[in-house]
Amino acid sequence: MSRRGTAEEKTAKSDPIYRNRLVNMLVNRILKHGKKSLAYQIIYRAVKKIQQKTETNPLSVLRQAIRGVTPNIAVKARRVGGSTHQVPIEIGSTQGKALAIRWLLGASRKRPGRNMAFKLSSELVDAAKGSGDAIRKKEETHRMAEANRAFAHFR
């Protein structure tokens, strides 16, 4: 039996302006080289641009985008008898949100455009509407899981 105590699960903190955990998760994923103030600037500019584009609550657009991109199921490589199978596994809500944020940021980095705030706002608006690169990534993941459904018993 382990002598070490079980680690407490950390709860996500909320950002100073919107008091929203999703915004803080987004900030922590966009962060590079420890420059958190720059990450906050990028996010807040993107939120302002969403407000101008859609003329609705930008946080609801953000929530809708993340909800649309969050996958329910993914595939995991599993080695069975010398061959590697892609085994479909269910994803929890926290891990799903983390994946969705990662995909949204990856898709917005690939976008052509002036700056990161502009690209991120465009990607979030597209994802909320049900289009964009991040949505395509989710659909591709679900297709992979559906195609490899026969290996679900290897879990």
Curated annotation (Swiss-Prot):
One of its GO terms (molecular function) is structural constituent of ribosome. One of its GO terms (biological process) is translation. SUPFAM superfamilies: Ribosomal protein S7. It is found in: Plastid, Chloroplast. The keyword rRNA-binding applies. Keywords: Chloroplast, Plastid, Ribonucleoprotein, Ribosomal protein, RNA-binding, rRNA-binding. Pfam families: Ribosomal_S7 (PF00177). GO terms for cellular component: chloroplast; small ribosomal subunit. The keyword Lyase does not apply. One of the primary rRNA binding proteins, it binds directly to 16S rRNA where it nucleates assembly of the head domain of the 30S subunit. HAMAP family: Ribosomal_uS7_B (MF_00480_B). Part of the 30S ribosomal subunit. NCBIfam families: rpsG_bact (TIGR01029). Belongs to the universal ribosomal protein uS7 family. This is Small ribosomal subunit protein uS7c. It comes from Cabomba caroliniana (Carolina fanwort). The gene is rps7.
